[in-house]
């Protein structure tokens, strides 16, 4: 497994991955729907899969002395690493913003503020993306477009739901909004809830992806 992960890191990581990490700084843009930031992490996974397909990675990897089910698992684990970096950067920069700016400048009129709860929301959207994209992709690894479009649609529906909650539910509009200094425990609970959803959804994604890939004729 470690050899497959090294292969993914050296041969399949697309350069845009590192560019998209910088998009976590969008938390400093006022009145922006910050949950959209995490779409770029999903887009990174798409570009990596496209790059691997165009370079004949599947034929190469299939010829290696590795378990067939480890092939999708390695790709998903590397994607999880990229997504966790994006989540961590967004959380860190959100904390910097929370500490550096006055409270009135931390309220986001377009969605949730850049705080711990945002990390939980982002994790939940990425978990939903993983659960849809990878099992569909590993049914037919040569076809990437439709799985990505469906997964991106689900992710944006969840983003839309979070934006709706921001304006309709006091928990989101009052308790979970604003900087980390206010209602810290509630925001931390929201973050850990989102991370738990991410872990569960991604675990299911691994299971279904490995099951589907077993049936693929290499």
Labelled PLM ranges:
Residues 1-58, 74-218:
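Hydrophobic alpha-helical transmembrane segments of membrane proteins
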Residues 60-62:
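Juxtamembrane/interface alpha-helical elements of multi-pass membrane proteins
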Residues 70-72:
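Alpha-helix N-cap/helix-start motif at helix boundaries, enriched for small hydrophobics
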């Amino acid at each position: 497994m470690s050899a497959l992960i090294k292969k993914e890191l050296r041969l399949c990581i697309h350069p845009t991955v590192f560019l998209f990490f910088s998009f976590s700084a969008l938390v400093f843009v006022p009145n922006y729907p910050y949950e959209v930031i995490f779409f770029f992490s999903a887009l990174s996974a798409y570009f990596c899969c496209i790059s691997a397909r165009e370079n004949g990675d599947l034929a190469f990897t299939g010829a290696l002395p590795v378990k067939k089910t480890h092939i999708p698992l390695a790709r998903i684990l590397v994607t999880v690493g990229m997504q966790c970096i994006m989540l961590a950067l967004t959380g860190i920069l959100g904390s910097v913003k929370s500490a550096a700016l006055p409270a009135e400048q931390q309220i986001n009129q377009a969605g949730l503020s850049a705080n711990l709860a945002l990390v939980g929301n982002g994790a939940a959207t990425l978990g939903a993306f993983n659960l849809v994209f990878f099992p569909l992709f590993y049914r037919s690894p040569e076809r990437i477009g439709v799985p990505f479009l469906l997964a991106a649609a689900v992710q944006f529906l969840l983003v839309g739901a979070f934006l709706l909650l921001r304006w309709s539910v006091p928990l989101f509009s009052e308790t979970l909004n604003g900087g980390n200094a206010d209602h810290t425990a509630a925001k931390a609970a929201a973050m850990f809830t989102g991370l738990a959803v991410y872990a569960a959804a991604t675990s299911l994604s691994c299971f279904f992806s490995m099951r589907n890939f077993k049936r693929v004729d290499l």
